[in-house]
């Protein structure tokens, strides 16, 4: 991977089928694991030499004990100051605005990103502040304006390209694959492509098949591209800022049902590491790896699991490419069991790639096969009850953990 990469109003609330009230939902605080001494980003690395020390000896077959830790327990916030509350889409906007203030080379382009403010208001107010050249409304032609953004990056700008819906970016797949991802390599290093491609996706509230795409499975095979998925206002802003500053092309995945999440974020400047997972809930019995909206389904299931005597460790992987196998590996060495929960399709999804990486690097530390819960391999139905059936629900997560921990 390192040989290919160039350098190192609001939306709807959570699904009505999810019992979490998004208007009251406050994203948990964040913390990473210990300082990295070694990072695994290439499949096939020697898991025996992992890190500076082993985390735990192999466990005996798990017998659930009473667990008193709250299911939503997380490490303390990275900020010592009260900060200010923002919805997730507002956090994205704030991060983008700060980077445009900081660097005059940062620009925005896409459909209705100008005075309309974007389909989910992530670019609201930017055209008034920075003008119509730095916040450019484009024709409805994804292939054209994506190519324009890549060309602008080749000449020294740092474009942020918005897809009104991630599904529409299929029309720009040639530009994203053959140009965005590969030009640094095919030009012999003459060009860097510091482009951010972002937009809403995921299964929404009866948006139909074409507007419910999860394109991470499509883009993960493109060499030279990094992919991250935000899940809280804090990491949405931090990942946005980090992606803009990166010399690599970065795709930032945003979920349509998370735009209204509210969280207090620091007043001081911060960025998130593009290749770092987030420890959401420490635990001992099983590692649950997830990202984006499924983070909240997992945390809902964790409350039930705690009441049943299980102590799950929940990690939001955030970096979809490359995987943070340091954080993941430390957790696997401690719990010896892995459940992956994703909204991506099962066939060829992120979960399949993550399963392969874990088996190749940490097979000797597993006491049970890696299990992956994914969306059904069907077009997303419009009918609400059928739409619910296609994606992983908290009850399925509870059942899977019980099976793995027998």
Curated annotation (Swiss-Prot):
**Keyword set, alphabetical order:** Chloroplast, Metal-binding, Oxidoreductase, Plastid, Potassium, Pyruvate, Thiamine pyrophosphate, Transit peptide
Q: What SUPFAM superfamilies does the record tag this protein with?
A: Thiamin diphosphate-binding fold (THDP-binding), TK C-terminal domain-like
Q: What's the Enzyme Commission number for this chain?
A: 1.2.4.1
List the cofactors: thiamine diphosphate
Residues where K(+) binds: 195, 243-244, 248
Task: List the GO terms this entry assigns under cellular component, sorted alphabetically.
Answer: chloroplast envelope; endoplasmic reticulum
Organelle transit peptide:
1-70
Q: Where is the signal peptide?
A: none
Q: Where in the cell is it found?
A: Plastid, Chloroplast
GO molecular function, a single term: zinc ion binding
**Domain of life assignment:** Eukaryota
Q: What is this protein called?
A: Pyruvate dehydrogenase E1 component subunit beta-3, chloroplastic
This protein's species is: Arabidopsis thaliana
């Amino acid at each position: 991977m390192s040989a290919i990469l160039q350098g190192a109003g609001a939306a709807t609330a959570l699904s009505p089928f999810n019992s979490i009230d998004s208007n009251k939902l406050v994203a948990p605080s964040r913390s990473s694991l210990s300082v990295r001494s070694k990072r695994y980003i290439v499949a096939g690395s020697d898991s025996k030499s992992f890190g500076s020390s082993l985390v735990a000896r192999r466990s005996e077959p798990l017998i659930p004990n009473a667990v008193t830790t709250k299911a939503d327990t997380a490490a303390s916030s990275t900020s010592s100051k009260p900060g200010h509350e923002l919805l997730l889409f507002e956090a994205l906007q704030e991060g983008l605005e700060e980077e445009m203030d900081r660097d005059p080379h940062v620009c925005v382009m896409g459909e209705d990103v100008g005075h309309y403010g974007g389909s989910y208001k992530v670019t609201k107010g930017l055209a008034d502040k920075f003008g119509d050249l730095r916040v450019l409304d484009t024709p409805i032609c994804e292939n054209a304006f994506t190519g324009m953004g890549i060309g602008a990056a080749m000449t020294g700008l740092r474009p942020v390209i918005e897809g009104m819906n991630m599904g529409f970016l299929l029309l720009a797949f040639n530009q994203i694959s053959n140009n965005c991802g590969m030009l640094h390599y095919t030009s012999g290093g003459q060009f860097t492509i510091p482009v951010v491609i972002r937009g809403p996706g995921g299964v929404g509230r009866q948006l139909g098949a074409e507007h419910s795409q999860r394109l991470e499975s499509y883009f993960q095979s493109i060499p030279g591209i990094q992919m991250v998925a935000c899940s809280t206002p804090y990491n949405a802003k931090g990942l946005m800022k980090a992606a803009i500053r990166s010399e690599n092309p970065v795709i930032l995945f945003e979920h349509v049902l998370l735009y209204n999440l509210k969280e207090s974020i620091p007043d001081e400047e911060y960025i998130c590491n593009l290749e770092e997972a987030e420890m959401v809930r420490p635990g001992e019995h099983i590692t649950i790896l997830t990202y984006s909206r499924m983070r909240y389904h997992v945390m809902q299931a964790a409350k039930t699991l705690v009441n049943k005597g299980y102590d799950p460790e929940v990690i939001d992987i955030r970096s979809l490419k490359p995987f943070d196998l340091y954080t993941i590996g430390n957790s696997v060495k401690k719990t010896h069991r892995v459940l992956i929960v994703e909204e991506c399709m099962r066939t060829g999804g992120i979960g399949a790639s993550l399963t392969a990486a874990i088996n190749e690097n940490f097979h000797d530390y597993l006491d049970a096969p890696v299990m992956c819960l994914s969306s059904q391999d069907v077009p997303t139905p419009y009918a609400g009850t059928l739409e619910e059936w296609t994606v992983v629900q908290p009850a399925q997560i509870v059942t899977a953990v019980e099976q793995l921990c027998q």
